[in-house]
Amino acid sequence: MPRIIGIDIPAKKKLKISLTYIYGIGPALSKEIIARLQLNPEARAAELTEEEVGRLNALLQSDYVVEGDLRRRVQSDIKRLITIHAYRGQRHRLSLPVRGQRTKTNSRTRKGKRKTVAGKKK
């Protein structure tokens, strides 16, 4: 398994798929990175030479925000929204949907398990 910026990527999968195992790299960005380094997207990740792995590491560290840095940036952005009392920040704080979805029904993923309320006594 080749290790790129601290992440083991699957060796048996094609390079364009293997790179998507890194947080922050999707299919489009994977293609772009492969094109910039002039690598074969159909080659298996195990077929990469040490020199190619080194170039890949250098490029990802210098030009892209991925893995831990990206996770930290997202968390700090959410914290900032909460501290400036933005509407989106308040939705994050209350664990409610942020992007305008309905909440009367659905939104269970965001709200969590149902909290049962006892029925009204006669």
From Swiss-Prot:
It comes from the Bacteria. Gene3D superfamilies: 1.10.8.50, 30s ribosomal protein s13, domain 2 (4.10.910.10). The keyword Chaperone does not apply. Keywords: Ribonucleoprotein, Ribosomal protein, RNA-binding, rRNA-binding, tRNA-binding. The keyword Lipid biosynthesis does not apply. Pfam families: Ribosomal_S13 (PF00416). Residues 94-122 are annotated as: Disordered. GO terms for molecular function: rRNA binding; structural constituent of ribosome; tRNA binding. One of its GO terms (biological process) is translation. GO terms for cellular component: cytosol; small ribosomal subunit. PROSITE patterns: RIBOSOMAL_S13_1, RIBOSOMAL_S13_2. Residues 101-122 have a biased composition (Basic residues). NCBIfam families: uS13_bact (TIGR03631). Belongs to the universal ribosomal protein uS13 family. Located at the top of the head of the 30S subunit, it contacts several helices of the 16S rRNA. In the 70S ribosome it contacts the 23S rRNA (bridge B1a) and protein L5 of the 50S subunit (bridge B1b), connecting the 2 subunits; these bridges are implicated in subunit movement. Contacts the tRNAs in the A and P-sites. Part of the 30S ribosomal subunit. Forms a loose heterodimer with protein S19. Forms two bridges to the 50S subunit in the 70S ribosome. This is Small ribosomal subunit protein uS13. The gene is rpsM.
